[in-house]
């Protein structure tokens, strides 16, 4: 039976980096790790409640967290920064207040910056969120997968694979369907492969979405 390894964890320390960049003492490590999780959840919940709707999706590719003794610095990599900037009341200022409440008990400062992703559809997280939004709007899954591949291929990637699992089109029995275009060398460490799994909440239940994107080979 084949054993599958996480594509990002497999390359961590070689061509992939951690999303949290800090050191801590052993007695406070777990607390800071939990705080990182809460900060990321706060950002994603804000996007889901105040930015995302039937036609817009958040477009968050990743969130990097840097820490100093009295400073927490967030880098939010997004393909569509205008969605967060255009409405200041519900946008960055509201998000900043929510995050500050989570770290205020340590009297630390918060610095938050937006980094624009120039080719958003080369990011599997953004592509998976697009697929989830379409599935939640009851678009046929095969049409969604083909459209997602078209969006990704415009950005000159080497290969892509999309898998959707669950009660597809409301079927009684759950199954998984996938489509692949181009190369996807999962066992090559030098292959710059990005991966994401994302849930889609439909009226028939939760569908699981997985996206693999092969950008280039690192020499």
UniProtKB/Swiss-Prot annotation:
Report any Pfam family annotated for this entry: Ribosomal_S3_C
User: Does this entry carry the keyword Translocase?
Assistant: no
Q: Where in the cell is it found?
A: Plastid, Chloroplast
| Key words of the record | Chloroplast, Plastid, Ribonucleoprotein, Ribosomal protein, RNA-binding, rRNA-binding
Quaternary arrangement and interactors, per the entry?
Part of the 30S ribosomal subunit.
Task: Name the protein family.
Answer: Belongs to the universal ribosomal protein uS3 family.
Q: What is this protein called?
A: Small ribosomal subunit protein uS3c
């Amino acid at each position: 039976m084949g054993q599958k390894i996480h594509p990002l964890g497999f390359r961590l320390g070689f061509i992939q980096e951690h999303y949290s960049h800090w050191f801590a003492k052993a007695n406070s490590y777990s607390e800071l790790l939990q705080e990182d999780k809460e900060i990321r959840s706060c950002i994603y919940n804000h996007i889901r409640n105040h930015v995302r709707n039937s036609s817009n999706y958040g477009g968050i590719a990743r969130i990097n967290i840097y820490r100093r003794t009295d400073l927490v610095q967030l880098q939010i990599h997004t393909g569509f920064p205008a969605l967060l900037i255009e409405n200041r009341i519900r946008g960055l200022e509201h998000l900043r207040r929510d995050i500050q409440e989570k770290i205020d008990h340590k009297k630390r400062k918060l610095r938050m910056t937006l980094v624009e992703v120039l080719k958003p559809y080369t990011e599997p997280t953004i592509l998976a969120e697009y697929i989830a939004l379409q599935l939640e709007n009851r678009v046929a899954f095969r049409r969604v997968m083909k459209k997602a591949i078209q969006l990704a291929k415009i950005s000159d990637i080497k290969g892509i694979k999309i898998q959707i699992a669950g009660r597809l089109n409301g079927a009684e029995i759950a199954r998984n369907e996938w489509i692949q275009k181009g190369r996807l060398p999962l066992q090559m460490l030098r292959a710059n492969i990005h991966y994401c799994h994302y849930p889609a909440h439909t009226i028939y239940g939760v569908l699981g979405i997985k996206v693999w994107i092969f950008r280039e080979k690192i020499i």
